[in-house]
């Protein structure tokens, strides 16, 4: 641990704030008659942040800033780099979609960068208030993005649902934080940990605080039964916004769980571990069983997300066995690996869906994917790779991610829970393979061909190659996650 008296550790966050202000000013100064420069400047910003956090991660150092409100450790650097890279890919995938719908404007890119800022603050927070600030920055930006097409009744309705339910979840989280503060007298995660570990705290207040905090966090992660917002928001939002919500925020939510439950409330593991067991089973059940009956593509992927968050929770709950955290690094790194690879696969999936859309046409139903292999065999193959990864079929990275989490669950002595997860995964494979069947064995609807620029084609190809190569050679990324988690647990 290295307390810092300079702003060097948080320089990337400051750079992002300056970049957002600069892009806003430049875009306003150019006026509406000229082409927006927000897109190339946003790409440049995300590239710089990816490289910056990546180089910081290579040092393996941990720094604290702003009176311990912020911690820049290897986990923060690695996850922030992936979030920035994920936004870069998202911006590339969504460019054509936005241009065809008159959404190719500066406000979209500034709000997207604000969501990235919220994710980074969530990942680097070392204080309940800092974490809440990052969460609200992400949430408020997301509300605005969902409502960006003001002329659409569907998106306006989705934004209102998102806002109301998000405010309710924030209230739950704040109430839980207030109870923790009342019991421990501090909002700093390290001080809360030591106060709870001392055993001199009112256990009733702590237990109620944990319940409200886990409920609030589960809403943000998208775990059942706090999942009500996900299907409606995924379906009602413009597909470009759906991708923004479905990707990086899930990685940041994982970091939020680690910061709060592991770094702050680990002595209460016996309380929150059983809560996560219940939440994970419900998420796997509702996500997989409900996705089967969906005909809307984005709604199906929404329920798919819920089931995947169940797997993330499985990794998180496996770190503590009989109140001992001996295998914590392995378990938490498996959940981190799962979150990162889920981001990678989600990007590829929605990238293909965005490619299938056109001006005046939204690829929203499963029927829209019929015969894709005849329109463009390469893009159909990439979609097949993404579906195999989401289903956990080798040799894709999704298979190894599920295997790593299941191994952690078994090592934690909960073999029965691993069996339940496998059974629901087998059920879930049906709706992923149904998409493959539609692409390869059904006749196409319409005559249009799938066309993409060289840049978009290259990005999708790299995305697909990464899903396969990381499935064949997962050791490097798994070791990166393990070292980051081990450093965080030891700091």
From Swiss-Prot:
Coiled coil: none annotated. It comes from the Bacteria. GO terms for biological process: ATP synthesis coupled electron transport. It is found in: Cell inner membrane. The chain crosses the membrane at residues 6-26, 37-57, 69-89, 103-123, 128-148, 163-183, 206-226, 238-258, 273-293, 301-321, 335-355, 379-399, 413-433, 458-478. GO terms for cellular component: plasma membrane. Its EC number is 7.1.1.-. It is an enzyme of class 7 (translocase). Keywords: Cell inner membrane, Cell membrane, Membrane, NAD, Quinone, Translocase, Transmembrane, Transmembrane helix, Transport, Ubiquinone. It is a multi-pass membrane protein. One of its GO terms (molecular function) is NADH dehydrogenase (ubiquinone) activity. It catalyses: a quinone + NADH + 5 H(+)(in) = a quinol + NAD(+) + 4 H(+)(out). NDH-1 shuttles electrons from NADH, via FMN and iron-sulfur (Fe-S) centers, to quinones in the respiratory chain. The immediate electron acceptor for the enzyme in this species is believed to be ubiquinone. Couples the redox reaction to proton translocation (for every two electrons transferred, four hydrogen ions are translocated across the cytoplasmic membrane), and thus conserves the redox energy in a proton gradient. Belongs to the complex I subunit 2 family. NDH-1 is composed of 14 different subunits. Subunits NuoA, H, J, K, L, M, N constitute the membrane sector of the complex. This is NADH-quinone oxidoreductase subunit N.
